[in-house]
Amino acid sequence: MSKYKILDSHIHLYSLANIPLLHWDEGNPLHGNRRLDEYIENSQSTQFDVEGVVWIECDAKIDLTQGLKGLENPIEEYLYICRNINGKLLPEEGVSTPFKRRLIKAMIPFAPMPLGSAGVEEYVKALKTRNSSEFHLVKGFRYLIQDKPPLTISDPHFVSSFQWLDSNGYVFDLGIDMRSGGLWQFKETLEVFKKVPNLKYIINHLTKPCLDFDPETIDSNPDFLSWKRLVTEMYITTPNSYMKLSGGFSEVEQDVALDVTSTSRHVYPWFKVVYELWGPERTIFASNWPVCAIPAGQNLTEKWFQVCETLFDSIGMDEDTRRKIYYSNAFKAYNI
């Protein structure tokens, strides 16, 4: 069998030079250089080749009360990624090579969704003004929901931002969190999905489920059953959505994260539900590097690949379907 090609649909990138834009101060395990240099070094395998990545914004520091003036950090973050693509990296930002310049296939910057459609449009125009030559790789936007208070996503301004993205052909990377947030996030999200059903939502990390639930008794767990009902409704409501098979290492206990077999066992019940919904055409692989490398350690992409292979083996998935999930489905999801 030939090696699999991978389009890693969820990685974060930053250097020590621009880490002040982010929340990861010294002492945070994510502090440091997390550039394409480090990603490539930690994504080697005899079983696959990473042929592309989708860059996802890092939740930069912002001040929405200042309008566009309070959004300089995510704009600078976008410009850093543009320098990775055009080969004009600053000395402390890494070493540019032809391979690295073509590795980023799509960009998903931050968008100020609570500011409404007018605020998002003004911000997107600012991105284009600051760098237009690489803007064609901006395929959508993200604004993390997982750590926000109730009623954030259901606010009329937020809904109008979704409508603007839909009208302009962008995707939205959706980050909600069952384990640390709660099922109320799913209920609010579902209500918004009903208002803007046709936007292409890319749902992150299997919805960050409670992977500490006992897999042996999970089928009778009321929270698992409620989650299953809600994600089923979410799937039915959004005909253009995709699900990322990613993020598992961050949701299990540390001792589990260090063992591929144990991680696979805890992920399986949740994977089975979402795969029966989104299926072989709308499921996409992602490593969530470097976030998931904190619990899993070095060679994250290889380890998560092994988890996925175990999951795929458990349902008898054929090789052609695996190739879709690892590679070609992400091209469709992100309009690449």
From Swiss-Prot:
<dbReference type="InterPro" id="IPR052350">
    <property type="entry name" value="Metallo-dep_Lactonases"/>
</dbReference>
<dbReference type="InterPro" id="IPR032466">
    <property type="entry name" value="Metal_Hydrolase"/>
</dbReference>
<dbReference type="GO" id="GO:0046872">
    <property type="term" value="F:metal ion binding"/>
</dbReference>
<comment type="function">
    <text>Hydrolase with high substrate specificity for L-rhamnono-1,4-lactone. Catalyzes the second step in an alternative pathway for rhamnose utilization that does not involve phosphorylated intermediates.</text>
</comment>
<comment type="similarity">
    <text>Belongs to the metallo-dependent hydrolases superfamily.</text>
</comment>
<protein>
    <recommendedName>
        <fullName>L-rhamnono-gamma-lactonase</fullName>
        <ecNumber>3.1.1.65</ecNumber>
    </recommendedName>
</protein>
<keyword id="KW-0378">Hydrolase</keyword>
<keyword id="KW-0479">Metal-binding</keyword>
<keyword id="KW-0684">Rhamnose metabolism</keyword>
<dbReference type="GO" id="GO:0019301">
    <property type="term" value="P:rhamnose catabolic process"/>
</dbReference>
<dbReference type="GO" id="GO:0050033">
    <property type="term" value="F:L-rhamnono-1,4-lactonase activity"/>
</dbReference>
<dbReference type="Pfam" id="PF04909">
    <property type="entry name" value="Amidohydro_2"/>
</dbReference>
<dbReference type="InterPro" id="IPR006680">
    <property type="entry name" value="Amidohydro-rel"/>
</dbReference>
<dbReference type="GO" id="GO:0016787">
    <property type="term" value="F:hydrolase activity"/>
</dbReference>
